[in-house]
C-alpha cells in the first residue's frame, strides 16, 4: 500500500471520530448592503453640512449651500457623523467576520471545542463530550422567530451552537440536530 492511500484511509477513520461544523459569521449580503448604505448616506449628510457651513456646493445634487448652518446644517452634520461611525462599526464586523467559527466534536480526545470570532478576541470553549446529555432543537415562531440547535450539558445552561441570524428552514435544523445527536450517541429533544 502506498503512503498516499494510507493517509487517505487514516483521514477517513479520523473523520468517523471527528465531526466539524463551520459557522458563518457577519459576512452576509445584508450586512454589506447596510454598511454601504450607511457609508453613502453618512458621507452625503456630512457633505451637505459642509456645503451649508462653507457656502459652496460639495454635492452634485440639490443646492445644500443655501441651507442655514444653524440648525439645519449642524443637525445634518451630526446625522452624517452618527451614520459614518455606525458604518465604520459595520465594516469592522464584516472585516473580522464576527461570529464565525467552528464546532469540533472530537471523540479521540473526548472534547467538544467551540471557537468563535469576537470583536476584540477569539472565544474558545472546551467541554468534555461525556457531559453532553442531549441535543435540543428550539423553535419559536412569531414576530421574533428563533430556530437553533443547542446542547444540554450536565450542571450548566443549554449551550447554543448554531449560527445567529435569519432562521433556518426546519428541515435543515432537524438534519443538523440529528447529525450531531447520532454522532454523539445522545437523544434529540424538542421535535
From Swiss-Prot:
InterPro entries the record matches: PSI_Ycf4_assembly
GO biological process entries: photosynthesis
Sorted UniProt keywords: Membrane, Photosynthesis, Thylakoid, Transmembrane, Transmembrane helix
Membrane topology: Multi-pass membrane protein
Protein name: Photosystem I assembly protein Ycf4
Domain of life the protein comes from: Bacteria
Organism from which the protein derives: Prochlorococcus marinus (strain NATL1A)
Subcellular location, record wording: Cellular thylakoid membrane
Stated family: Belongs to the Ycf4 family.
Role: Seems to be required for the assembly of the photosystem I complex.
This protein's encoding gene: ycf4
A UniProt-annotated Pfam family: Ycf4
Annotated HAMAP family: Ycf4
Listed GO CC annotations: photosystem I; plasma membrane-derived thylakoid membrane
UniProt KW Acyltransferase keyword: no
Ranges annotated as spanning the membrane: 34-54, 68-88
Coiled-coil intervals: none
Keyword Thylakoid: yes
Amino acid at each position: 500500500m502506498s503512503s498516499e492511500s494510507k493517509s487517505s484511509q487514516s483521514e477517513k477513520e479520523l473523520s468517523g471520530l471527528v465531526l466539524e461544523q463551520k459557522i458563518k459569521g457577519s459576512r452576509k449580503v445584508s450586512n454589506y448592503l447596510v454598511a454601504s448604505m450607511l457609508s453613502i448616506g453618512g458621507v452625503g449628510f456630512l457633505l451637505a453640512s459642509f456645503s451649508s457651513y462653507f457656502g459652496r456646493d460639495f454635492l452634485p445634487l440639490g443646492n445644500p449651500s443655501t441651507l442655514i448652518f444653524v440648525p439645519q446644517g449642524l443637525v445634518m452634520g451630526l446625522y452624517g457623523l452618527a451614520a459614518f461611525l455606525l458604518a465604520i462599526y459595520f465594516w469592522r464586523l464584516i472585516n473580522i467576520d464576527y461570529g464565525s467559527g467552528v464546532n469540533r466534536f472530537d471523540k479521540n480526545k473526548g472534547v467538544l471545542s467551540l471557537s468563535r470570532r469576537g470583536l476584540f478576541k477569539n472565544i474558545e470553549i472546551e467541554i468534555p463530550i461525556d457531559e453532553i446529555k442531549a441535543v435540543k432543537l428550539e423553535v419559536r415562531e412569531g414576530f421574533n422567530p428563533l430556530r437553533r440547535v443547542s446542547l444540554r450539558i450536565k450542571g450548566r445552561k443549554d449551550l447554543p451552537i448554531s449560527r445567529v441570524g435569519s432562521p433556518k428552514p426546519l428541515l435543515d435544523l432537524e438534519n443538523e440536530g440529528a447529525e450531531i445527536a447520532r454522532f454523539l450517541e445522545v437523544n434529540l429533544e424538542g421535535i
